[in-house]
Amino acid sequence: MKNRNPLIRKLLTQYFVTTGILLAFLVMIPLVIRFIAGTRTWYGTEPIYYILRFFADRWLFCVAIGALLIWFGTTIYYMTKAIGYLNETIQATTQLIEEPSKRITLSSHLIDVQEEMNQLREKSLQDQRAAKEAEQRKNDLIVYLAHDLRTPLTSVIGYLTLLKEEPQLSNAMRNRYTEIALQKAQRLELLISEFFEITRFNLTTIVLQTETTDLSLMLEQLTFEFLPLLEEKNLNWQLNLQKNVLATVDTEKIARVFDNLIRNAINYSYPDSPLLLELVESDSIHIRLTNRGKTIPEEMIGRLFEPFYRMDSSRATATSGTGLGLPIAKEILLASGGDISAESKDETIIFNVRLPKPANN
């Protein structure tokens, strides 16, 4: 730990200072004895005379023995103190492993170590919670994916079984059942494709084939392509796109980002409402997509882009979405040096996209 060295230095300083003071006191004793001995005339009948005479004749030996005892005593004392600190730290480490939920408390001399160990404990608890949440989201995704795979697959099997077992069906009904089975199979293909794509983005580094792209033109083309879908829900575009906004991006992947965002906005918009798309270039390139829909709770906003998080636990498939479009969009934007965020209030949903300006700008 980074706080061990100051504690060791402190103990060593105390050890040497204490030893030095005691040795200085020891050296002064012979001087005091000599001073006392010289203050008067002593007689052999006085008991203290023999003591003074003993120290006067053997003062060097006495000082050496005293110095040895001082060194031995202070060394034992501070070694015991250091071992006590070590044992206290070992016990705290054991507690950190066996009882991570319990706060660590050490003696006042180890307050810095205590704070650092408690910080490690908190981080470990946070990591454990995050790992459990991630594992739970993965388990939920498997359940949801199995449900979403089974639903269209069941429909495909059902309609194909009808076609096989009902030879008397009219051509019109056969065509209708075939068309429905094809639509369900296409949804199944889309779901599997997006699931593998988000998994690939999470496990590998996204490789970008960058080029200079006119975002203004790209967004205009995308909005035109979505007109049939907008007409189905009586939605309409409100565009505020700055002209000639260039960006160095992977054109195909960035188009995928805006395709996902627009589909999401269409799926979750109220009928007969506008979709506002804005493009502005300032210090960075900013794209904002606004639609009218059910307000997203604040606690769910930050988790919209998590691959294994679902806001709607019921997993209604009325929108025909896979639920993986937003995580894919964020992965692409982060790899492109940009970012994405969302906000929602008063039945309005806003997605904000930021991209870096080209280096030559």
UniProtKB/Swiss-Prot annotation:
Residues 144-359 form the Histidine kinase domain. It is a multi-pass membrane protein. GO terms for cellular component: plasma membrane. GO terms for biological process: cellular response to phosphate starvation. It is found in: Membrane. It catalyses: ATP + protein L-histidine = ADP + protein N-phospho-L-histidine. Autophosphorylated. Its main location: membrane. SUPFAM superfamilies: ATPase domain of HSP90 chaperone/DNA topoisomerase II/histidine kinase, Homodimeric domain of signal transducing histidine kinase. CDD domains: HisKA. PANTHER family: PHOSPHATE REGULON SENSOR PROTEIN PHOR (PTHR45453:SF1). This is Sensor protein VanSC. It comes from Enterococcus gallinarum.
